[in-house]
């Protein structure tokens, strides 16, 4: 059983939902990332999503675009991000880590080379936001052969045939994007989310995570009532940006928000 599957099974047994924070690796500097990962786990994170900085993050809003820019000022590469996970694993062998980013850096590294390096460092999953499921077969096969879960996004606009295709390709969990548009966008309609999750559950037994639009403890709690996991990104990255000159303070305010969310979800 994979680390992600084990984590969801333990949460289910405890009657709890997963809290999944997203941060961009290398933001505001490379030395901050591993301590931030540990701080988030201490604050109640169940799975960590680690963004791989990319020069053209078209699915992301300005908050995460700027996080990528801050990380790329330090020339943070995919190999370095994998190295950060390896360092994190020296002290934490249990918390699943999913890399989230764009296909180009993985293609440049090569699917096989990436999967081998990621698996040996302790990466549990990969979410490539710009890889359509129709074109994902080769990467999915390579990831699975090395025990890395391919994770996919579903959107409010996803039709039934696409939902089925994605659920067939995915493992670990399925990530439902609760809003149209880019990350960091506006309001959240939990009833509409619940309706869409019911349609997705007809095609998979995988846990369903919901992200986009989760900003505070209240929205995290409301989404946790209908989803298996709550993903929070821009709200955390905003706080990191506000404390760019004092990363330790940034880690503290990120931890405070996650602890509030965890308490509200439980």
From Swiss-Prot:
Disulfide bonds: none annotated. GO terms for molecular function: tryptophan synthase activity. Keywords: Amino-acid biosynthesis, Aromatic amino acid biosynthesis, Lyase, Tryptophan biosynthesis. The active site is at 49 (proton acceptor), 60 (proton acceptor). Gene3D superfamilies: Aldolase class I. It holds the Pfam family Trp_syntA. Coiled coil: none annotated. Pathway: Amino-acid biosynthesis; L-tryptophan biosynthesis; L-tryptophan from chorismate: step 5/5. GO terms for cellular component: cytosol. It catalyses: (1S,2R)-1-C-(indol-3-yl)glycerol 3-phosphate + L-serine = D-glyceraldehyde 3-phosphate + L-tryptophan + H2O. Its EC number is 4.2.1.20. The keyword Flavoprotein does not apply. It comes from the Bacteria. Tetramer of two alpha and two beta chains. Belongs to the TrpA family. The alpha subunit is responsible for the aldol cleavage of indoleglycerol phosphate to indole and glyceraldehyde 3-phosphate. HAMAP family: Trp_synth_alpha. This is Tryptophan synthase alpha chain. It comes from Thioalkalivibrio sulfidiphilus (strain HL-EbGR7). The lineage of its organism: Bacteria, Pseudomonadati, Pseudomonadota, Gammaproteobacteria, Chromatiales.
